[in-house]
């Protein structure tokens, strides 16, 4: 079994430990998954991660691979672009600061919703990959945030310590994803999320980015406190959305604000 498969198994087991509680005696007929996010009204908390595909609708968000867009010339340092990026979070690999800053300036010129550093790329440094090791300090993050002029996200936060550093550095948001600990047998995203939420909720926006197989998994992350769920999946967004709507109806949650711990069952101890 590959290391990636082992991580998937841990992620799946952690998610399945949170069981949805059916509530059928209520008056919820239709559900509303919209919210106001960074001043923009969006229809769904599901945020797909893509290489070069614009959001499915003006009221949807998406993560885009900024390194890919820069390398292919689809972003060239002004407001003209193959896509309208005002609904996009543009994710960069955390390289050297001297190389990052010119990229940040080019990306900011396109007026994206936010920029992000994809810290999960550091899991692929030697001896497990060819990505160069360029960690970022609190001061680096604060400098990038100041230079960006748009909200800065950190994708791939997998510990309370890093979440606290991110909060202290003044970033807008973190995305919790244990892929950063791929080769460390790190805790699954759903396992570490509650600790991170308890530590920094209210000081930084917290999103989830772990394994998502269905809209039911999206619901689980939302119940743990995620504002949105960043999804690396080939599944159609509409299918995930239909499944999330189903989960909300069957648990009596009319809006995203209704989704919370009371909608899930997570036994702490097994009976001996």
Where are these regions (language model features)?
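An N-cap/entry alpha-helix motif that binds or orients negatively charged groups
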Residues: 1-43, 268-272
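C-terminal extensions of enzymes
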Residues: 1-8, 235-272
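Active-site cofactor/substrate anionic-group-binding motifs, chiefly glycine-
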Residues: 36-78
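Glycine-enriched alpha-helix->loop->beta-strand junction motifs that scaffold or abut catalytic
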Residues: 64-70, 83-88, 109-113, 147-150, ...
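Alpha-helix-loop-beta-strand connector modules within alpha/beta enzyme cores
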Residues: 82-91, 133-153, 185-208, 239-247
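Catalytic cores of alpha/beta
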Residues: 98-109, 158-171, 195-208, 212-228, ...
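Glycine/Thr-rich beta-alpha phosphate-binding loop at enzyme active sites
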Residues: 112-140, 157-196
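Glycine-rich phosphate-binding active-site loops on the catalytic face of alpha/beta enzymes
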Residues: 121, 169-187, 212, 218-238
